[in-house]
Curated annotation (Swiss-Prot):
Protein name: Aspartyl/glutamyl-tRNA(Asn/Gln) amidotransferase subunit B
Assigned EC number: 6.3.5.-
Family stated for the protein in its record: Belongs to the GatB/GatE family. GatB subfamily.
SMART domains: GatB_Yqey
Quaternary structure note: Heterotrimer of A, B and C subunits.
GO biological process: one example: glutaminyl-tRNAGln biosynthesis via transamidation
Organism per entry: Acinetobacter baylyi (strain ATCC 33305 / BD413 / ADP1)
Enzyme class: ligase
NCBIfam families: gatB, PRK05477.1-2, PRK05477.1-4, PRK05477.1-5
Length: 495
């Protein structure tokens, strides 16, 4: 489903840093958008009082058994289809054995040998337009742990098990990234995809989307170096900062002849450093074995086919279509497909504006004035007081010369504040563009008569003088004169 564009054929720029090649692999944990947990009926709603959403299953009480939530399987399949991956139709759950206070069972139900999603890939686009394909090793289902609370009780720690059993999809990349830019672009691409497919809200502030970054250095052509894992990074800014800091740390050690210890490290954004958390475990440290309480997940061809039928057009395909159909730039197409909601909004604006021929002006308005108003007001797209149909209707009035681009900004401001259509605003505020040739000629003649010096300057070759005269006409018409007509008539009258 992800076909690399022509940009993928570009020769990549060198990513060497002082002769070292950076190697990065990413593990992403994204919370699946289900109403209940993966193995119990407890709610997954965020922000509730501690331990109010933990059932007997989540608490690991004796005699209770996990029951798989079918929806998490469907969402995992949906993701697999989105990255053109292999779907294992006989997937197995395993117990990952370790002890943490916020994990009541003493193990985590995860997947090891038979993950539900196998090899796949996703294409990322870098700032210079280069497209690179990143391999996805696997994506497997697992349950989240609870949360330890250390700052609410003096001398004691609390345990909140509301998150215990929350369904996660862990997405593991190949170590294909060779720079911080590529790593951030990959994580952003996965973030866009899981929201686009509706499998996760991707809310990083609430812990719905977290990244672990494995970083190592090597000389070009050498075997992979020893990697360190940067754990639980939950913002794109922190991800970029943490990887840069870790690269510098490892480079300094290696340049002085030292060796890198394989370990898990935490990033401290205040001190701008990473510090050791624990030695990095290998799979055999967790003593994985199939969970005896859960049967293998058998996925029928019909189930995959039914999910495939509900798949939306993917971001990469939509970008390519926008470029071809609406004649917009790669950059515009990239920005307009950062979310499915924005892409849908843009297409609705184009339709209301009169069709594909107006794709570029629609892109300019959506990305410019409209997005600026959203940001200034601190609103999400869904809360916009101006609908796609209203914005497209206003653009249609620019296209048919009812209003100029300058007047359109005034119209948009009134639409934003009053929630009315462009046509209503134009009529109520008397903002219709003046296109009557006689009326415009009369204004031009008055301006020329009052500015004889500027007329002579223009005749002597000073183009600025002409622009000044046009500005005077626009001012006299209160911005209503058609700029193209003003230019044409002005030149005709000056001779």
């Amino acid at each position: 489903m992800n076909n690399p564009s022509k940009a993928a054929q570009k020769k990549p720029k060198s990513n060497l840093i002082d002769g070292w090649e950076v190697v990065i692999g990413i593990e992403i944990h994204t919370q699946l958008a289900t109403q209940s947990k993966i193995f119990s009926g407890s709610s997954t709603e965020f922000g509730q009082d501690p331990n109010t959403q933990a059932s007997l299953v989540d608490l690991a009480m004796p005699g209770v058994l996990p029951v798989l939530n079918e929806e998490v399987v469907n969402l995992a399949i949906r993701f697999g289809l989105g990255i053109d991956a292999y779907i294992d139709q006989a997937s197995v759950f395993a117990r990952k054995n370790y002890f943490y206070p916020d994990s009541p069972k003493g193990y985590q139900i995860s997947q090891m040998d038979n993950p539900i999603v196998g090899l796949g890939h996703i294409d990322i686009q870098l700032e210079d337009g280069t497209v690179k394909r990143i391999g996805v090793t696997r994506a497997h289902l697992e349950e989240d742990a609870g949360k330890s609370i250390h700052d609410q009780f003096e001398g004691q720690s609390g345990i909140d098990l509301n998150r215990a059993g929350t369904p996660l999809l862990e997405i593991v990349s190949e170590p294909d990234m060779r720079s911080v830019e590529e790593a951030v672009a990959y994580i952003k691409s996965i973030h866009t995809l899981v929201r686009w497919l509706g499998i996760s809200d991707g809310n990083m502030a609430e812990g719905s989307f977290r990244a672990d970054c494995n970083v190592s250095l090597r000389r070009p052509g050498d075997a992979f170096g020893t990697r360190c894992e940067l754990k639980n990074l939950n913002s794109f800014r922190f991800i970029e900062q943490a990887i840069n800091v870790e690269i510098e740390r490892q480079m300094e050690i290696l340049e002085w002849g030292g060796t890198i210890d394989q370990e898990t490290r935490l990033f401290d954004p205040n001190k701008m450093e990473t510090r050791s958390m624990r030695s990095k475990e290998e799979a055999n440290d967790y003593r994985y074995f199939p969970d005896p309480d859960l049967l293998p997940v058998i996925i029928a061809d019909e189930q995959i086919k039914a999910i495939k039928a509900t798949m939306p057009e993917l971001p990469a395909a939509r970008r390519e279509r926008f470029i071809a159909e609406f004649a917009i730039t790669e950059y515009d197409a990239h920005v307009l497909t950062l979310s499915r909601e924005m892409a849908d909004f843009y297409e609705a604006v184009v339709a209301a504006a009169g069709g594909a021929a107006h794709g570029k002006i629609a892109a300019n308005w959506v990305m410019g004035e409209f997005s600026g108003a959203l940001n200034k007001a601190g609103l999400e797209l869904a809360d916009s007081p101006v609908s796609a149909e209203q914005l497209g209707g206003m653009i249609a009035r620019i296209v048919d010369n009812t209003i100029s681009g300058k007047i359109a900004k005034q119209v948009f401001g009134f639409m934003w504040d009053e929630g009315k259509s462009a046509d209503t605003i134009i009529q109520e505020k008397s903002l219709k563009q003046e296109t009557d040739t006689g009326a415009i000629e009369a204004i031009i003649k008055d301006v020329l008569a009052a500015n004889e010096k500027m007329v002579e300057e223009y005749k002597s070759g000073k183009e600025k003088a002409f622009n000044g005269l046009v500005g005077q006409v626009m001012k006299a018409s209160k911005g209503k004169a058609n700029p193209a007509q003003v230019n044409e008539l002005m030149k005709k009258l000056i001779g």
